[in-house]
Amino acid sequence: MDRAKLTGVVLRAVDYGESDRVVTLLTAERGKVSAFARGARASRRRFGGALEPFTLLSAEVRERSGSDLLGLDSVSVVRGFGALRGDLGRIACAGYAAELARELVRDHQPHDELFELLVAYLDALDAGPPRPAALRAFELGALRAAGLMPRLDACARCGAPVGEGPVRFDAGEGGALCAGCAPGVPRTLPLAAGTLAALLRLQDGGLAAAASEPLAPPAGREAREALTAFLEHHLGRRLAARRFLDEIGPLLGA
């Protein structure tokens, strides 16, 4: 690729030197890419506010000799998601979704499913307050796109049905555990029958199912703890945006 036009969501923007900026995009065409925006901080005339996180933009890029970074020549805003930027809770959820998307995928590997999911989740945040069920649906969808979906429909260890009662969940084992396997696994997390059923509905129905899924406490807490543990197991750490959500989460249920 010498020059190309990409459509992408800004996942991160980092200042570089006195006047430049490096942006990471999740694009529809090429997956995750990073681009060098020369002079982006010195003059707003060229890029305006288009390089802010969560912005959906159209970008003209070019390859740069001897560098893994693309050159960012021009951009235009497709969606600014202005409504979500006026609310701390929505900003926190958008930041978490962007960081999770950035960490789950490798560079230059197309991820149409994750790109579309991220745009849809930002649309939902732009339209109204954050919903715990929507964030869980985003996490599950992002894990599916990355090939890391937890096993919830049967025991992750032996494959047996888990039944209709409460179960245990273990990230290292890969998901829910039946009554026969759970006692042999230390430090498992509880999942009530209603919590497991809600997660299965969100796993199958995605963001559309989240609109009719209340996921109220204690189910919301159990679902959050299980998916947070699963993500930490695969990523090797707790995301910075997740830690921020933990600070303000009691106000959001996120």
Curated annotation (Swiss-Prot):
The keyword DNA damage applies. The lineage of its organism: Bacteria, Pseudomonadati, Myxococcota, Myxococcia, Myxococcales. GO terms for biological process: DNA recombination; double-strand break repair. GO terms for cellular component: bacterial nucleoid. This is DNA repair protein RecO. HAMAP family: RecO. Keywords: DNA damage, DNA recombination, DNA repair. It holds the Pfam family RecO_N. It comes from Anaeromyxobacter dehalogenans (strain 2CP-1 / ATCC BAA-258). Belongs to the RecO family. Involved in DNA repair and RecF pathway recombination.
